[in-house]
Regions:
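Conserved N-proximal alpha/beta basic substrate-recognition cap immediately N-terminal to
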Residues: 9-109
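A short beta-turn/loop motif at secondary-structure boundaries
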Residues: 41-43, 165-169, 254-257
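Phosphate-binding site of ATP-dependent enzymes
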Residues: 139-241, 262
């Protein structure tokens, strides 16, 4: 079976976090090639399956990325419809409307007035990755939060405002990685944003915040039953919505003030899966790719 792994021109060999996937696929008998997603010379129809892994520049050109996904069609995983929906964080409103516990999120579109802010908040754009253009603001610097919202919406982008949940300081984020609807491994990510920190500095061509490249940021972790139940509900909703279980997904969650898990993000476009943190994770993803969900 011929498998194309879609990456970007800035990561032509992929990224260390998830590179173990390539030899795992080869050991399983696949013919694997890394291809740059927006290279016009790639014949995507020559591949049996195309798997999105490292197109980490897509947030700069989302429309082109979605068009590319739709042109590749049904050989693509995750599916084009999932990529279109999940590549803008307004999908959180859909999940909340479906009754899933989601971190309270206010969307501010271009032309909307800046909403009243309460307590410590996080501001970020709906199309972004790697903590880019993101800030954490206490009430003392709400004027800076409003300025970031206005900068984003003034540039034609939609901003989102969420409360900062202090439980992240003690426990971090829990991320459950799912392959074909089954749990593969659990990650623990420490807090990224320092108090009153706006748009952390980037030191990488992809524009991700400096802290996102810290090798100590994410480690193998454990999930409790409530977190596992939430991850299963989220993936179940996506499967029902699109008629197919996503091949891969990372379900990021925090603990709210009442001690229950709430969804922070569902990463189903190009999440870092941190395959190297957990023995067998790369092999599980390879098996899912070679026998994708239906």
């Amino acid at each position: 079976m011929r498998i194309a792994i879609a990456t970007c021109s800035l990561l032509p060999e992929g990224h260390d976090y998830d590179r173990p996937l390539l030899p795992a696929l080869e050991r399983a008998g696949a013919d694997v090639a890394l291809e740059v997603w927006d290279d016009p010379d790639v014949a995507w129809h020559d591949y049996d399956r195309v798997v999105v892994r490292w197109p980490w520049d897509y947030t700069h050109k989302r429309d082109a990325f979605v068009e590319w996904a739709e042109s590749v069609g049904d050989r693509l995983h995750n599916r084009p419809a999932v990529l279109r929906w999940n590549s803008e964080k307004s999908y959180l409103a859909d999940l909340s409307a479906a009754g899933l516990p989601v971190v309270d999120t206010t969307l501010v579109q271009p032309g909307d007035p800046v909403p009243e802010l309460h307590g410590e908040v996080v501001v970020k754009p709906t199309v972004s990755a790697g903590a880019r253009d993101t800030g954490r603001f206490s009430p003392a610097v709400h004027h800076e939060a409003r300025a970031l919202i206005e900068r984003l919406t003034g540039a034609g982008r939609t901003a989102m405002v969420q409360p900062y949940l202090p439980a992240v300081e003690a426990r971090g984020e829990t991320a459950i990685v799912m392959f074909a609807g089954r749990e593969s491994h659990v990650l623990r990510k420490r807090a990224v944003l320092a108090p009153d920190e706006q748009a952390p500095p980037a030191d990488h061509e992809l524009g991700s915040a400096q802290v996102m490249w810290d090798p100590e940021l994410v480690r193998a972790g454990e999930a409790n039953d409530a977190e596992r139940e939430l991850a299963a509900r989220v993936i179940g909703h996506v499967a029902e919505r699109f008629g197919e279980t996503p091949l891969y997904a990372r379900v990021d969650m925090l603990t709210d003030g009442g001690g229950r898990p709430v969804l922070l993000e569902l990463e189903a476009v190009e999440p870092a899966l941190y395959l190297a943190t957990t023995p067998g994770a790369a092999e599980r993803l390879a098996a899912a790719i070679l026998s994708p969900p239906t």
